[in-house]
């Protein structure tokens, strides 16, 4: 996993934890019975509702934890093996993908868009971190605009 992808995952995780509201109250909300001024409300007896704590937290936290675990594993694997996860073939050597394209009736996709190597290796075109900043800014702005 390259540093751009790791940065995107880290920003997504940070936005998930910052945007998840801890003070959200479920149910009907408000102090329904005691708002009328009579102790116990309209029914004449006070009721105590105890809600159990959520078992796993919000689904957003679970998804963010999974994303963080995947990002951490990818970064750890990338650091353990060096900058790229696969050794590039030298001049005159055939790589894994060259064999299938050189054979008669091969798929002919080469190392283009459809190549797994092009999507997973750290080499190739380098994307700018603008998309990460845009994603983080959008998530932050949505949290600020929320009532």
Curated annotation (Swiss-Prot):
Q: Which residues are glycosylated?
A: 107
Induction of expression: Strongly down-regulated in prion-infected brains (at protein level).
Signal sequence segment: 1-24
GO molecular function, one example? nucleic acid binding
This protein's UniProt keywords: Amyloid, Cell membrane, Glycoprotein, GPI-anchor, Lipoprotein, Membrane, Prion, Signal
How does the record describe the protein's post-translational processing?
Answer: N-glycosylated.
Expression by tissue, per the entry, reads:
Mainly expressed in brain (at protein level). In brain, it is highly expressed in the hippocampus and cerebellum and is also expressed at lower level in other areas of the brain including the cerebral cortex, the thalamus and the medulla. In hippocampus and cerebellum it is highly expressed in the cell bodies of pyramidal cells and Purkinje cells, respectively.
| Bilayer disposition of the protein | Lipid-anchor; GPI-anchor
Q: Which residues form the propeptide?
A: 123-147
Instruction: Report the Pfam families cross-referenced here.
Output: Shadoo (PF14999)
Tell me the InterPro entries matching this sequence. Answer: Shadoo
Q: Where is the composition biased (Gly residues)?
A: 26-43
Tell me which domain of life the UniProt entry assigns to the organism this sequence originates from: Eukaryota
- Which parts of this chain are annotated as the region Disordered? 26-45
In the record, biological process GO terms are: protein import into nucleus
Tell me the function of this protein.
Prion-like protein that has PrP(C)-like neuroprotective activity. May act as a modulator for the biological actions of normal and abnormal PrP.
| Miscellaneous comment in the UniProt entry for this protein | This protein is a candidate for 'Pi' factor, a PrP(C)-like protein able to compensate for the absence of PrPC in mice lacking Prnp.
Q: What is this protein called?
A: Shadow of prion protein
Task: Please tell me the species this chain comes from.
Answer: Mus musculus
Q: Which gene encodes it?
A: Sprn
């Amino acid at each position: 996993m390259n540093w751009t992808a790791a940065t995107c995952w880290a920003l997504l995780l940070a936005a998930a934890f910052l945007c998840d509201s801890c003070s959200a109250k479920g149910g009907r909300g408000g102090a329904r019975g005691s708002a009328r001024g009579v102790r116990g409300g309209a029914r004449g007896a006070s009721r105590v509702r105890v809600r159990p704590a959520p078992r796993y937290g919000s689904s957003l936290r679970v998804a963010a934890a999974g994303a963080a675990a995947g990002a951490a594993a990818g970064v750890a694997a990338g650091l353990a093996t060096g900058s790229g996860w696969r050794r590039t073939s030298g001049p005159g050597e055939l790589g894994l993908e060259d064999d299938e394209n050189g054979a008669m009736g091969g798929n002919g996709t080469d190392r283009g868009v459809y190549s797994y190597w092009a999507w997973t290796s750290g080499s190739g075109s380098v994307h700018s971190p603008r998309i990460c900043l845009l994603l983080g800014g959008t998530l932050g702005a949505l949290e600020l605009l929320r009532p």
